[in-house]
Amino acid sequence: MKRDYYEILGVARNATPEEIKKAYRKLARKYHPDVNKDDPNAAEKFKEINEAYEVLSDPEKRARYDQFGHAGVDGNFAGQGGFGGGAGINFEDIFSGFGGFGDLFDMVFGSGRKARQGPVPGDDIEAVLELTLEEAVFGGEKELRVTRTETCGHCHGNGAEPGTPIITCPTCQGRGQIHQEVKTLFGRMVRSQVCSTCRGEGKIPKTPCRECGGSGLVRKTRSITVKIPPGIDHGHRLRIAGGGEAGRFGGPPGDLYVYIKIKPHKLFKREDIHLKLEKEISFVQAALGAKVEIPTIDGGTEILEIPEGTQTGTVFTIKGKGVPVVNGSGRGNLYVTVKVVTPTKLTERQKQLLREFEEISKQKEETFKEKFNKFKNKFAL
């Protein structure tokens, strides 16, 4: 038994056309055979989804379905019901020869004369956009070159050379499907399949378009403007609706997914919303303390006070000079790690001063030891 069309698309019976279209696009993209090549059930699910959408997206067919159920839209209903074994009989041929009865048959049971494929959404495509750290931090707009399938502008997608007619397919005589009589255990049956010449359309261009060869589609490389939100990070993905491949049979285009790649920076390293920087200071600055200029991602500088006695590896925080929160407020911090640089080339005067410094340090250490020993001996038992 066929599943309910509303159930297939996951929508309520009073769903709006927009809700039905949205549900269809999501499911069609999920179960498209090209995306699920390893899933043997994907093609059948995709066919089921298209069948449901073809009925529910058409106001007339939807009304018949709501009133009669599947019988109101199933063109094979008469052949499956109580009209006999159907040996060698094609009911649509019978009813089509009786004028108004053919129209009545179509109205009640749906026309099986066309195997036209339902609207097929275009495929999604992916691209990589490389940014500098500054571009990622502050956002903006950047151009991206993308190659994709588009509707042919020369023939506007109908596949015919402008000024030439669209004719009835000579293979299927406009039915969109080919009928073959086959022998089965139950007698002779009529089997239908989509016409390969017109792909179920029932019509073909008399003179194929010189630009697209009759397919209605062409490959184009376009420059697309991508809006970069401030604070975007490496690996983030941006979705550009309708930026993908063109749809077929009136289907909507797919989407473009842009993956962000951030170039390494010569000064800063990023961790989430924070930036890190290593700053070299001299031995004297570390020992005596100093005020040093720290570059920021904004392009300016901040004054950092180095207290006397600072050791290598000490981390200082400059608040609010990191990365903005994506789609939020506030910024991270800039963490500065100091590295005390030991001098490698000293003058004799500098060496002498360091020796004097070392001697004074030793004297202080010896004086401290003497005082400590006297204190210890005084209270010794």
From Swiss-Prot:
One of its GO terms (cellular component) is cytoplasm. One of its GO terms (biological process) is protein refolding. The J domain is necessary and sufficient to stimulate DnaK ATPase activity. Zinc center 1 plays an important role in the autonomous, DnaK-independent chaperone activity of DnaJ. Zinc center 2 is essential for interaction with DnaK and for DnaJ activity. GO terms for molecular function: ATP binding; heat shock protein binding; unfolded protein binding; zinc ion binding. Keywords: Chaperone, Cytoplasm, DNA replication, Metal-binding, Repeat, Stress response, Zinc, Zinc-finger. Belongs to the DnaJ family. Homodimer. Its main location: cytoplasm. HAMAP family: DnaJ. The gene is dnaJ. It comes from Carboxydothermus hydrogenoformans (strain ATCC BAA-161 / DSM 6008 / Z-2901). A zinc finger (CR-type) spans 139-221. It holds the Pfam family DnaJ. This is Chaperone protein DnaJ. CXXCXGXG motif repeats lie at residues 152-159, 169-176, 195-202, 209-216.
